[in-house]
């Protein structure tokens, strides 16, 4: 289902530039980029460009998807309006190179085939110069493949599987979230120090690319810390009744329950784990916290829980751009943004900056700018970041969180303490570890 969010088209001096000029390639030196590729230059008018937004607004991942959507919409509104907020990111004027961003939103339902159908419409009907979004890693992988086939840039939304920037990486896809390897390598030493090094762990693993790669990475790095796996229970995506798996976990003798489920599956499995007495007999670790797991499960169950995520709103105390994001998001939406919203917000700004650096919307030029960002990193809501040229994985800090006790919460949304922000460079996988081969620009 598509939701139209057309914006007023406001021209600017930059709107007079001819969209077919490969200015970025000329500025960077080297061979000229193709004058026509994908939806370029057809998708660039004198005063606007179109961006397609894909995310689940129904189904298992609807909470994360709805948050992601609001982050995209806030960034687009700010960029279109111009002024102090986009200027603080380094953007000039209103819009991107003087062009307003038009957009539509598609509900992917968390299903790869639905996501591809929606994105295909954005490309063929709307001449999208960019499409963004996902919550399921499976849909992210499918959208990456579409992007490289149609030669249209794609910014991955929420997707933690190593495969997204590993064996399924694509030249036209970029990921802003840390991958499973990075998150696990950052989290494992923290939980081992806090909980102990000689512990037994039981894993609950959703049976798709995200669950399996998070399991592989977290099992590897906790084993290096001295943990022993006593049980791995695999469950289908969208499971309603976890009793069989949880009964086995309750009887496993484990010290730690590692719950890899995401979205509403994480909420349901955690609540059911409490009914089986697991949370009173074991420590809970969540390698990748869902956007609203805190609120939906409640602080009584989430207190003392360790996990990682992309962003937590109290990081506004650390980074000026994060403070502006949190404040403006709260003003518009009346709740503190979760990390889904942050992904959408941050990556929209990074795309706009990359277009301005390239001097145009030609996707080949924009990709090359993003691939060169190590030498010219972006200042962002989580500090300095860049995309690695070899696999398009963002190198970025990783927050490690611990759930607060209800009595320690300073407000209704103060669910976590940020106990560490791990340097991204220190936890990166070797670029060839997961078999990434990016493919051709053209």
Predicted regions: what they are:
Residues 18-24:
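C-terminal segment of classical bacterial N-terminal signal peptides
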Residues 2-12, 24-442:
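Extracytosolic ligand-binding ectodomains
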